[in-house]
Regions:
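N-terminal signal peptide c-region/cleavage motif recognized by signal peptidases
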Residues: 12-16
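Beta-barrel outer-membrane channel/assembly domains of diderm bacteria
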Residues: 18-158, 182-183, 189, 283, ...
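Surface-exposed coil loops of outer-membrane beta-barrel proteins
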Residues: 33, 115-133, 137-138, 148-252, ...
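Transmembrane beta-strand segments that form the barrel wall of outer-membrane beta-barrel proteins
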Residues: 68-75, 151-166, 191-193, 245, ...
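Solvent-exposed loop/turn segments connecting transmembrane beta-strands
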Residues: 76-82, 145, 158, 166-173, ...
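Hydrophobic, lipid-facing positions within transmembrane beta-strands of outer-membrane proteins
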Residues: 85-89, 135-139, 177-179, 241-245, ...
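Outer-membrane beta-barrel translocator/channel fold
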Residues: 108-114, 189-242, 284-359, 433-463
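C-terminal structural cap/anchor segments
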Residues: 332-423
Length: 464
């Protein structure tokens, strides 16, 4: 952690560059609902708001809030089903002298708790808590020098490739205790530094050293690669925290490059990069090309958790590519491929380990499906074919995504996905109906997910 503080000091000393709008009083990067439709619209702070208001008025009126009501029902291999409901309130004050306060309160299942009475065995689904959850998932102090530096410290929300707090199928988020620093080095380059020492997994009321591999959060699909048990890594084998450093290069809206390095304490180091480039044939037709590479290792680490529990150390390489075609924001088709390889005696036959995206499947891999990806299925290769479209051209009220994934991995699987988002015409602004379904087939001898598997979830949300 000492190294992180040195980086923070250095970033603050060299904050003298112009920037894009990422570090801005109008971009609330701690808000999980920052880019979603809201009935209350957006509060845009102007230069006049900053110059002509008193300090208290700036604090109370130059900020933002989102109140989100949520209800969801999921079916996990009929007749196993579960529901959850609740509301989340995010609030951030306006900046005064560069400083702002923010936080989010999550309230799930306040009156009736579904528990496990609708579920067989120990099948659990972390995105839909089975118990009552009332917790401040975020509480932070922010300092911002617009277009140059932003520091967020406390219980914070992260949105990076391998530490991602939110997915639109979640009723609750997975937040971190730590510090996030963004520094706009030039107009095109932004640097990011992260240091954390605790994690609050979905459905928890407190921050701790657990990861998504601990047995309390065992997934309904993925089981131990060596024993077939749902207890992937026993409780008590957690992580003391993480360090991450990123460099984001974005010279235009059509090209970006992301470079990341992570150190997940007691687990592994991760080096990762991806790049995307769009080619416009004309105003309606365009292609998108992407590549991603990565490496995991245990340099400088002794007695990592995977080794201690008998799964072998982490040692793996990743490579992937995608090509997509889109027409006039109405239709998109995409084909992607990922390969992940390492020593067969290493963790999951040479696979990656991902402490904070495992089983949530919100990692950056191109071929990840709704139910699983290479992180869940182990070393090998996978490919994905998908299409996204609006059923009625020119009408954006309904969006449908169809996808097929093939995993030629330690734990092989085929998966079909259907994802529908619907904004009812004439309904209150901010109301969204989200329905997704996943059907997977795996060999009966597959220790991860033997036989057929079906998952369906309906999410109703209202954002104000």
């Amino acid at each position: 952690m000492k190294n992180l503080w040195l980086v923070l000091i250095m970033l603050s000393m060299f904050a003298f560059a112009r920037a894009d709008d990422y570090i801005s009083v109008n971009n609330y990067i701690q808000n999980p609902y920052n880019n979603q439709i809201s009935a209350g619209g957006r509060n845009f702070v102007t230069e006049s708001d900053i110059q002509n208001k008193g300090l208290w008025e700036q604090f109370f009126t130059n900020g933002t809030y989102n109140a989100v009501g949520l209800a969801s029902w999921a079916v996990l291999n009929v007749p196993n089903n579960n529901y959850a409901y609740g509301a989340n309130l995010f609030m951030q004050s306006g900046h005064v002298g560069g400083f702002a306060l923010g936080g989010m309160l999550e309230v799930v299942n306040p009156f009736l708790q579904p528990g496990y009475r609708y579920l067989s065995g120990d099948i659990s689904y972390a995105l839909l808590p089975n118990q009552q959850v009332v917790t401040p998932s975020e509480l932070y102090l922010e300092y911002q020098l617009p277009n140059q530096v932003q520091v967020d410290g406390g219980w914070i929300f992260l949105e990076t490739p391998w530490m991602n707090s939110y997915d639109d199928a979640m009723l609750v988020s997975g937040t971190f205790q730590g510090v996030l620093v963004n520094y706009q080095m030039t107009d095109n380059w932004r640097l990011t530094a992260i240091g954390t020492n605790a994690y609050q997994e979905m459905g928890s009321n407190s921050f701790n050293q657990d990861t998504m591999y601990n047995s309390s959060y065992g997934n309904f699909v993925t089981r131990s690669p060596s024993t077939g048990l749902q207890q992937v890594i026993p409780n008590g084998y957690g992580s003391d925290g993480s360090l991450a450093f990123g460099a984001i290069y974005k010279p235009s809206a059509d090209y970006n490059l992301n470079l990341w390095g992570y150190s997940f304490s007691e687990y592994a180091n991760t080096l990762y990069a991806d790049s995307n480039y769009q080619v416009h044939l004309n105003s309606s037709n365009k292609f998108n090309f992407g590549v991603q590479v990565g490496n995991q290792n245990t340099w400088g680490m002794a007695n990592t958790v995977p080794e201690l529990v008998g799964y072998g150390g982490v040692n793996s390489y990743l490579g992937g590519a995608k090509i997509a075609y889109s027409y006039d924001e109405w239709f998109k088709a995409e084909l992607s491929y990922d390969g992940m390889y390492g020593q067969q005696s290493s963790f999951y036959g040479g696979g990656f380990i991902s402490p904070y995206t495992f089983t949530i499947v919100n990692d950056p891999l191109y071929t990840s499906g709704l139910g699983a990806g290479l992180i869940e299925q182990g070393a090998g290769n996978s490919w994905r074919a998908a299409t996204t479209f609006h059923p009625i051209p020119g009408d954006s009220h309904t969006k449908i995504e169809l996808a097929y994934e093939q995993f030629n991995t330690v734990s092989p699987m085929q998966e079909w996905d259907l994802d529908i988002k619907w904004v009812p015409e004439g309904a209150p602004r901010g109301l969204i109906v989200h329905w997704e379904a996943d059907y997977a087939i795996a060999p009966s001898s597959d220790l991860v997910n033997g036989g057929d598997f079906f998952f369906m979830q309906t999410i109703l949300s209202y954002n104000y």
